[in-house]
């Protein structure tokens, strides 16, 4: 069978049988160039025409094996020595299609197919040629399998990458056969057996839009990363991403990874049908070579594919649009049209350089199926390939290599050497640049290591300094604490030294006081004797003095005093007489534990008589009932007059008469007051007292009961000015006055003997005499009252007494009164402008004379008490042992100095003195 190319000579007339079959020749075109058929050469890679034209498109057929489920015989046969495909129709006719080569997958695998038809094109790319390998055919014909292969058989893409980067072996024959001059010249034409540096881009054309599959396919990219949409500018995709490198394995893995991102869908025609065109662009910048691998989507019928839905129909329509645009471009070029519609599709726009560039070659692989059901698709594909094979390009006549002169050969070789030298220079330059970068990186790394070493040394230094600073800080704190403790120790030593000096001074003072004690006792005894004698001398003038005092008091009413006197029937013989006991009833002295407590007489109030209670415990033991005698005694007031010349008798009588007129019948009113019932000491008697009056100028004698009179008088010591325990009762006259009580202050622990508390009613005159002479023997009268109340007590103290002595007497009085809760109090200095009370610590340093004067009387003072509310105890630092001892020593010495020791006095001794 003749080749499908037209012949210049007319052929024989057709026979009737030939007229019934499919035409064997491609229809001629009016623009088609007619040239004689030429015999292909061995080792050719698409032979050139004998004249001045060449075929830029080489068409190879790839027939897949028959599907396992398909029935019937194959509809395709290989004819013409493996360069033609015969298609048998259903009616028994056949049609032959002449191609540049045919390969059957049952007889030849992908590796054999690649070595036989593709490797020669790849070797041309390695030396700077440009080649486009596109796979065309209906869906399910094996296009993607031929281009990408499978795990066991790599496709054209991966084999081409390996050959370009790693350098393939010698050439396998061209389309016309193997062997010949081309064998053994492949490596010589390449110049080296070394790998090259390439750049690879992977594009996808889906629904007439170009997408970059390499975008979002990095190691850190997610699987559902969006694809980047690109635009065509200058026959190329703008801003496309490239994979650069010279390692075939690495680039192959990247391409395999992004190839899986293509849009694939299952149809009735193909279980895994590609719904987009895939284009892999591989550039070799060092030699200017370029390889484009195009896996086209298969054209299909919408109804036959079973596509439903708008999106599926749109996909099929866009696929068919691209394939149809490529057919029109091929027909236009083959027909020699002046206008080629490259811009009808994005696919044809990217393939424009492949059709127009004189140095570019196109290898079109037609994939077909031998299934009789796909016969119409197979015929359409073969017609498309036959049409593309008719494309010719007017080019300069190629000079045969065997006819080239030595000069031309040397020129070509020199140009190749220059190119290789330039490439080597670029590689060396790049190597130097990388070496420089490596040196810089090493220097930076070295600097970083030095900085790291410095930082480590600095860190160690800082840690050492920190430890040293911390230790120094600790030492400084220890030194400061030690210094402060030393300073405090020195202060304590100084304080101890001062306290020792004070202690020595106090001990010296104590010795002086002990030496002065006998002298003081002698002085006190002398004063007592003098007063007793004076009281005895004035006993006769007591009655007249009472009247004078009543008149001198003016409008001040007389207070009535009622005292309960218990008489012991067993000791009637031991009652003192009035004359012998008048002085002893006015004073009492007790000594308990070598401590002497002093009491005095008030100047303003003169008690006419005092009655003492007997020892109740002895009475209870004896079982004898006591007889109670009550007597109302009128109390007189004495107004102390300054020492002056006696007044004229006439003037005195006139003044007494005026006073009597002003005072009225207060004495008659006083007689009607009832005597109160017996009460404990300190209780107020609000009821009128029952009183018994005799002669106004006489005092009824009362019975006195004393203790044991047989005691040895030697047991009695010096007697200080005594104080009488009295009870002041209210009356219509005396209720206008503040009650004043003079009491002998007893020790709380050791009560006073009943011998010193007994007296009789006839001693009132002597007491009046003593009251008139108060203040003459160095005694001070102190009247006690609460801050917002009446007078509650009157005391006599030594002139050198202080507030602490007065506090002790008052506390003993409160304790003797039997109060369940002893109320705390403080002293007020009414003359102090601030009104602040005297603190208890300062009472020992405040003398009695600092108290305010009472009614402007000399040696008469008023002590005002303020109740102290109990406050929660506050935490106080305890005294050191030395301070505690010092305070105790100070208090003992002070008490000893103020209260010299005296021996108890016997009543017999007092009788002897009075006699």
UniProtKB/Swiss-Prot annotation:
Gene Ontology molecular functions: ATP binding; ATP hydrolysis activity; microtubule binding; microtubule motor activity
GO CC annotation: cytoplasm; kinesin complex; microtubule; phragmoplast
Transmembrane segments: none
Protein name as annotated: Kinesin-like protein KIN-10A
Gene3D superfamilies: Kinesin motor domain
Chain coiled-coil ranges: 426-517
Kinesin motor domain span: 56-391
Gene name of this polypeptide: KIN10A
Binding-site residues for ATP, renumbered to this chain: 137-144
GO biological process: microtubule-based movement; plus-end directed microtubule sliding
Taxonomic placement: Eukaryota, Viridiplantae, Streptophyta, Embryophyta, Tracheophyta
Organism of this sequence: Oryza sativa subsp. japonica (Rice)
